[in-house]
């Protein structure tokens, strides 16, 4: 990542109470490069400019700290990201908060393959990737009512999503 984007990312994260260390910054850089590589073969995101990805995907994903306390995220909890797509917001949360057990769920197996590859490259042991539809997974006793938090971006309207 360029120095100016790095500096801006660090400053913007600090504004929402997140101190990014070198390991986290390196992970976001690897994530970004892997996203571009896979996006060339399959459509993961229309947003590909480095500045935009860091602002509109990575930083936006971390705004969960406006709703869930940093203390809760730091001490550990479980979070399911329904319809995660390219891993937003779940993967950025997993990078910054390693004590959060993140379950990434998507209905397209090719996106799960990308996510598994990214998780492996980042060495994240706190992430599980699941190929499933939300409405099917909601009936699975292994996951039903087992998560502390659930998040989603651009999957369905809230009333539909809350049924899952």
What are these regions (language model features)?
Residues 81-85:
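Conserved S-adenosyl-L-methionine
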Residues 26, 48, 52, 59, ...:
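Residues at secondary-structure transition points
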Residues 7-9, 87, 113:
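A generic alpha-helix surface/boundary motif
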Residues 77, 99-103, 107-164:
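S-adenosylmethionine
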Residues 86-99, 163:
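Conserved SAM-binding loop of SAM-dependent methyltransferases across substrates and taxa
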Residues 1-74, 80, 117-127:
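Class I SAM-dependent transferase core
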């Amino acid at each position: 990542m360029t120095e100016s984007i790095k500096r801006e990312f660090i400053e913007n994260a600090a504004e929402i109470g997140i101190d990014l260390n070198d390991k986290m910054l390196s992970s976001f850089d690897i994530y970004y490069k892997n996203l571009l590589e896979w996006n060339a073969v399959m459509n993961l995101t229309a947003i590909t400019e480095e500045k935009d990805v860091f602002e509109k995907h990575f930083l936006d994903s971390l705004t969960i700290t406006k709703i869930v306390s940093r203390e809760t995220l730091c001490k550990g909890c479980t979070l399911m990201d329904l319809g995660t797509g390219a891993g937003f917001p779940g993967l950025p949360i997993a990078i910054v908060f390693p004590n959060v057990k993140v379950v990434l769920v998507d209905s397209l197996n090719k996106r799960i393959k990308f996510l598994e590859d990214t998780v492996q490259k980042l060495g994240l042991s706190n992430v599980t990737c699941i190929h499933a539809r939300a409405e099917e997974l909601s009936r699975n006793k292994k996951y039903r009512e087992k998560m502390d938090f659930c998040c989603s971006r651009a999957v369905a309207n809230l009333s539909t999503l809350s049924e899952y």
